[in-house]
């Protein structure tokens, strides 16, 4: 299924039903008094998070949702039926924004969590409600109010504990696949990963974390080049970022050049994301001699003044993976 992480929908809640003007008319009761009933409330429109969904694709084809109007009141003090509500299912992690005002209405981050996005109109009052000691035959009633209508922007931001970032083809997908079993495409051409993928990493019983793999970032991404910058928002909820670095890059650049590219694009995108806890993960150590490896790591640590944790791994050969996952679990428990 195609991954869609944005949608704009137009929602119209139901109008409230009108109150009724009516008088009781029965044999032998010439002055039965007012018996006009109230109208029914208009139907509401809700969003509900569903953990069986992982895309907003359905909302790209159906953009307008209109709830049912409340029915009008009738005689014998009969109230109109309330309009039926509409419930729109969205993936967990959906951010809800008022499209016109840009106000963030809220986030849906738990299964079956509900959010009211358009409230139905109030019911109108029938004339029975206006009877008093001084007005025994009221002829007034009220109209039901208009239901809310608005445009809602939905943005899916995946919920993951850990996120991976780096240039294309640095081994992010291989790492995520090997530690979680997530089904992510792996090949030797750029942008193999076309959309974010989530994987669940189970270390031991009650010890697990969710990891997100997003498309690679290239130079100029913040100006629209490549794919990765669009999906960086999916890392905003992560508690830890893993910057995967290919020690034998296919673009014939020194690894430090690629590190600089990713960090520059990350900084341009969001300082908040740039300042998130980040570990450097040096991948493909199996393709270098010990001397070459030590020299490159020494140069990178000196150039970038790395004080954060860093790891030497081979995602293909699964070298250093167990230690990395164990340390991630410990970090997330802090």
Swiss-Prot record:
Residues 68-77 have a biased composition (Low complexity). Its cofactor is Mg(2+). GO terms for molecular function: GTP binding; GTPase activity; magnesium ion binding. One of its GO terms (biological process) is ribosome biogenesis. GTP binds at residues 166-173, 191-195, 213-216, 283-286, 314-316. Residues 1-159 form the Obg domain. It is found in: Cytoplasm. Residues 160-333 form the OBG-type G domain. Pfam families: GTP1_OBG, MMR_HSR1. GO terms for cellular component: cytoplasm. Keywords: Cytoplasm, GTP-binding, Hydrolase, Magnesium, Metal-binding, Nucleotide-binding. An essential GTPase which binds GTP, GDP and possibly (p)ppGpp with moderate affinity, with high nucleotide exchange rates and a fairly low GTP hydrolysis rate. Plays a role in control of the cell cycle, stress response, ribosome biogenesis and in those bacteria that undergo differentiation, in morphogenesis control. NCBIfam families: Obg_CgtA, PRK12297.1, PRK12299.1. Belongs to the TRAFAC class OBG-HflX-like GTPase superfamily. OBG GTPase family. Monomer. This is GTPase Obg. It comes from Buchnera aphidicola subsp. Acyrthosiphon pisum (strain APS) (Acyrthosiphon pisum symbiotic bacterium). The gene is obg.
């Amino acid at each position: 299924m195609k991954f869609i992480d944005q949608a704009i929908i137009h929602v119209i809640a139901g109008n409230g039903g009108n109150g009724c003007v009516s008088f009781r008319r029965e044999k032998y009761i010439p002055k039965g008094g007012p018996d006009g009933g109230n109208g029914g409330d208009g139907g509401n429109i809700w969003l509900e998070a569903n953990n069986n969904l992982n895309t907003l694709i359905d909302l790209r084809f159906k953009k307008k949702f209109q709830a049912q109007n409340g029915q009008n009141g009738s005689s014998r003090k009969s109230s109109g039926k309330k309009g039926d509500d509409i419930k729109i299912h969205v993936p967990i992690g959906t951010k809800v924004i008022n499209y016109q005002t840009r106000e963030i209405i809220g986030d849906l981050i738990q299964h079956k969590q509900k959010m009211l996005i358009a409230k139905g109109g109030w019911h109108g009052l029938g004339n029975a409600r206006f009877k008093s000691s001084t007005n025994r035959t009221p002829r007034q009633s009220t109209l039901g109010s208009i239901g809310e209508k608005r445009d809602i922007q939905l943005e899916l931001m995946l919920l993951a504990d850990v996120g991976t970032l780096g240039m294309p083809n640095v081994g992010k997908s291989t790492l995520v696949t090997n530690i979680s079993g997530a089904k992510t495409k792996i090949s030797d051409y750029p942008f193999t990963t076309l959309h974010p993928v989530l994987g669940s990493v189970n270390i031991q019983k009650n010890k697990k974390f969710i990891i997100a793999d997003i498309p690679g970032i290239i130079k100029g991404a913040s100006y629209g080049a490549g794919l990765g910058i669009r999906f960086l928002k999916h890392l905003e909820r992560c508690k830890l970022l893993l910057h995967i670095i290919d020690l034998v890059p296919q673009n014939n650049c020194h690894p430090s050049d690629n590190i600089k590219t990713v960090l520059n694009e990350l900084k341009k995108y969001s300082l908040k994301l740039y300042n998130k806890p980040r570990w450097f993960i040096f991948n493909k150590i199996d393709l270098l001699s010990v001397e070459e490896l030590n020299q490159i790591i020494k140069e990178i640590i000196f150039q970038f003044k790395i004080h954060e944790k860093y790891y030497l791994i081979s995602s293909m050969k699964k070298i250093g993976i167990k230690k990395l996952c164990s340390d991630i679990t410990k970090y997330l428990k802090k």
